[in-house]
């Protein structure tokens, strides 16, 4: 019994590379992956197509098309299907595909947990079938979760190098806890390396604990893994974050996100007709060439609205200075570190995945999925270019 690689697949890859060069890499890789999955199915079944043998477990049942996004482009995959497996035999899904798509594996486990625990809906069932291509059992879910968790925990506990700048953010997801559905905080930290200016995802944490305790423990875990050399921390004014920074990173300057300050200011504008002028006034503050000019513009802003919008003037005088810390950095560095907008794409990718699951069965399931997503994003960042030129002034 032999299950060798089809020579036609190799010839196809060669032809694609000859005709298209590097631009054909995604097609060439898809051909190889499809061949690997076909070969894996034959080994799983114990027989190749049309092969008669007593060792055969079941039969091939065609292929299911799937488009997979990767760092080299979209891959048109053909996922092998099986049928007529003996009772008690686990279903087939190519390991070669799963190993390359951590976030998809995590999402399948999250949805499968809901299905197994009896909290699924008709919609979740359909998603499970669509993503997994087979029914799931509790043993399959446990095995998949254990393998994935070991890999993700290793990533979360890896050593951290010196980071010049750190950005912190928080988001909330729905999790089942104690018979009810509650908001669970997801804390994220990214950094800019002091040596090469590249961005990296430092860590992620999921917890139902009180905000200040969660932030303090999260920051402590980053320091334990080697975080040092931080010149500036940028974040929004999240509950408990400032207290956590004071406890764990005293003396490190804090920059409050200018974008969120702009948005928060609108809550204190008494008339719709004033909103555009208020926004422009704050832009004049934030876009000043140096700190002294920013403070002068802030003084003019407060004076301008002291009578016609006193609540806005008082709020601005107390809060806007927290968004001016970034003026201690070189001009080019300021544009990157004055807001948390650099985390926007990361949060979008997380949201795109978590909204499919809707409500997570537990904290571990949420942590698994979020970690898997940020690991993939981090790999893309590491393979990409410089985020901040540390030699620029």
Question: Residue locations for each model-derived region?
Answer:
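Active-site phosphate-binding and catalytic loops of NTP-dependent enzymes
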Residues: 43-58, 150-161, 173-178, 380-383
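Mobile genetic element proteins and their domesticated derivatives, centered on retroelements
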Residues: 37, 72, 84, 111, ...
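Conserved beta-strand -> loop -> alpha-helix junction used to position metal-binding or nucleic-acid-contacting
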Residues: 170, 232-239, 244-281
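RNase H-like nuclease fold core
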Residues: 63, 78-85, 92-101, 131-234, ...
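DNA-recognition alpha helix
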Residues: 122-133
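Short, conserved DNA-binding cores of transcription-related domains
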Residues: 2-90, 94-98, 174
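Acidic/histidine-rich catalytic cores and adjacent linkers
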Residues: 1-6, 39-42, 47, 284-393
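Short, amphipathic alpha-helical "recognition" segments used to contact nucleic acids or chromatin
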Residues: 106-118
């Amino acid at each position: 019994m032999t299950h060798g690689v089809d020579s036609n697949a190799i010839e196809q890859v060669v032809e694609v590379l000859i005709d298209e060069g590097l631009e054909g890499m995604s097609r060439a890789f898809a051909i190889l992956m499809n061949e690997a999955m076909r070969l894996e199915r034959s080994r799983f079944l114990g027989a190749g197509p049309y092969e008669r043998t007593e060792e055969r477990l079941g039969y091939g049942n065609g292929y299911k098309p799937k488009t997979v996004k990767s760092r080299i482009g979209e891959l048109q995959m053909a996922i092998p299907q099986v049928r007529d497996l003996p009772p008690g035999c686990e279903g087939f899904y190519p390991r070669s595909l799963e190993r390359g798509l951590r976030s998809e594996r995590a999402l399948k486990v999250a949805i499968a947990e809901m299905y197994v625990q009896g909290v699924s809906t008709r919609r979740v069932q359909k998603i499970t079938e669509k993503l997994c291509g087979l029914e799931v059992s509790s043993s399959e879910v446990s095995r998949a979760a254990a393998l994935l968790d070991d890999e993700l925990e290793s990533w979360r506990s890896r050593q951290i190098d010196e980071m010049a700048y750190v950005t912190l953010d928080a988001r909330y997801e729905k999790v089942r806890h104690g018979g009810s559905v509650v908001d669970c905080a997801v804390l994220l930290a990214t950094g800019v390396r002091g040596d090469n200016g590249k961005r990296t995802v430092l860590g992620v944490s999921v917890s139902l604990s009180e905000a200040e305790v969660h932030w303090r423990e999260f920051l402590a875990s980053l320091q334990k893994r080697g975080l040092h050399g931080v010149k500036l921390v940028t974040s929004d004014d999240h509950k408990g974050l400032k207290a956590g920074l004071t406890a764990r990173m005293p003396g490190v300057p804090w920059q409050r996100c200018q974008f969120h300050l702009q948005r928060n200011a609108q809550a204190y504008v008494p008339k719709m007709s004033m909103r555009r002028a208020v926004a422009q006034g704050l832009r004049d503050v934030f876009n000043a060439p140096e700190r002294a000019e920013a403070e002068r513009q802030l003084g003019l802003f407060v004076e301008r609205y002291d009578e016609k919008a006193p609540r806005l003037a008082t709020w601005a005088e107390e809060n806007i200075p927290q968004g001016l810390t970034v003026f201690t950095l070189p001009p080019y560095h300021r544009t990157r570190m004055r807001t948390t907008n650099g985390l926007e794409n990361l949060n979008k990718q997380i949201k795109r995945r978590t909204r499919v699951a809707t409500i997570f069965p537990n904290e571990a399931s949420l942590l698994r999925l979020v970690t898997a997503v940020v690991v993939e994003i981090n790999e893309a960042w590491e393979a990409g270019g410089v985020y901040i030129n540390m030699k620029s002034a």
